[in-house]
Every structure is written in C-alpha cells, then in structure tokens.
Amino acid sequence: MPSLWDRFSSSSSSSSSSRTPAADRPPRSAWGSAAREEGLDRCASLESSDCESLDSSNSGFGPEEDSSYLDGVSLPDFELLSDPEDEHLCANLMQLLQESLSQARLGSRRPARLLMPSQLLSQVGKELLRLAYSEPCGLRGALLDVCVEQGKSCHSVAQLALDPSLVPTFQLTLVLRLDSRLWPKIQGLLSSANSSLVPGYSQSLTLSTGFRVIKKKLYSSEQLLIEEC
C-alpha cells in the first residue's frame, strides 16, 4: 500500500506538469499593447508619432509591479525619469515665456518689461517638467496660461503652446508675483496709464521667486491640482 507521502508527491507532480506558464498569466507584451492603446486614446485625432506611449513592456515589470513601483517613487526621483525631448521643449518654452514677459501689460497702456530671476526660471522649468511627466504627450501637450498677480488682481499676460498643431491634453496656469519691494515703481507705472506719454517700454520690474501653478487635465474630470512654490 503506497504511503501518504507517495500519494501526495504523485499528485503534486501531475498537477504541476499539466499547468503551463502561458495559462497562469498573459505575456508581458499584452500589457505593453494595452498601455500603448490607452496612451493613444488620450490623444485622439493625433498620429501615433505625436505622443509618447505609455508602453511598459520594456520596463522589466509586470502590470502589478509597474503600478507598485510608480506609487513608491518620491517626487525628487522624477528627475531621474526626465525625458531629453521634454527638457529641450522646456528650454524653448522658458525662452517664449521670457519674451512674453518682456512685453507684459499690467493695467497700463504701455508694456512693462518683467524680468525673471535665474532662480525663478530654473524652478518654473523643473515644476513644469514634473507636472508633465505623467501626460501622454508630455510637455508638448501643454497649454500654458501666464498670469501676474498685482495686489488683489491678477493680469493675464500670455497663452503659450509649444506645438499649436497638437490638441492640448492638459492646461497649466502659471501665476507669477511681482517683488513686493517694487510697489512704489508699480504704483508709478499704474498712475501713468492715462497720461499722454511717448509710446514705448516702461521701466523694468523684477518678479518674485515665489509662484503658483494650477494643472487641469483636459481629458479627465479630475479635480484641479494646485502647486505652491
């Protein structure tokens, strides 16, 4: 009579031999294809070359591992996931931003030249890249509204799009602030709004290093994300 251990061993070996790896779970490529389709769906009416897919088939993780890995990444670690193309686009965007600020109007008929300190320029660039990292089209899908706070009012300065041919997937509102030490100059600028001065630029004004960014996804009903820096 066979022992209990022999029967258990025979049953286990026959069970394991009848099971195939393919039946346990789908191949990793199926997850990559599904992720790619999801990314392309978010950029409807765009060619596939216009978007960075959300393909994770080459990441070395399965769906569950990918999700748990991304959940565990802290915000500073996103610098390690930077995209060279997005970094190049961000540099161009910062140049457009400075050009727009050089002709800003703050309630006056004459444009003021608003200057961004180097620290502010660097911080804004990093924040925009961080907010764009999870978007299907990256920074190319951003529509950037630029505003400047002046006391209790907020003036719209410009609306920038890196790729006008691309349907925006998310909107960023950048709220800059004037340096509080410049209030006497600002008041003088506003008081000259109705004066008959020779057309041209008013005096230059420096912006504060503090700013706020509001993110709104245009393909989702998620709540607004407000980042204070």
Curated annotation (Swiss-Prot):
Its main location: mitochondrion. The modification Phosphothreonine is found at residue 20. One of its GO terms (biological process) is protein-containing complex disassembly. Keywords: Antiviral defense, Apoptosis, Cytoplasm, Mitochondrion, Phosphoprotein, Ubl conjugation. Induction: Strongly up-regulated by hypoxia. Up-regulated by dexamethasone in skeletal muscles. Up-regulated in various cellular models of Parkinson disease (at protein level). The keyword Nucleotide-binding does not apply. GO terms for cellular component: cytoplasm; cytosol; mitochondrion. It is found in: Mitochondrion; Cytoplasm, Cytosol. InterPro entries: RTP801-like, RTP801-like_C_sf. Belongs to the DDIT4 family. PANTHER family: DNA DAMAGE-INDUCIBLE TRANSCRIPT 4 PROTEIN, DNA-DAMAGE-INDUCIBLE TRANSCRIPT 4 PROTEIN DDIT4. Regulates cell growth, proliferation and survival via inhibition of the activity of the mammalian target of rapamycin complex 1 (mTORC1). Inhibition of mTORC1 is mediated by a pathway that involves DDIT4/REDD1, AKT1, the TSC1-TSC2 complex and the GTPase RHEB. Plays an important role in responses to cellular energy levels and cellular stress, including responses to hypoxia and DNA damage. Regulates p53/TP53-mediated apoptosis in response to DNA damage via its effect on mTORC1 activity. Monomer. Interacts with BTRC. Identified in a complex with CUL4A, DDB1 and BTRC. Interacts with TXNIP; this inhibits the proteasomal degradation of DDIT4. This is DNA damage-inducible transcript 4 protein. It comes from Rattus norvegicus.
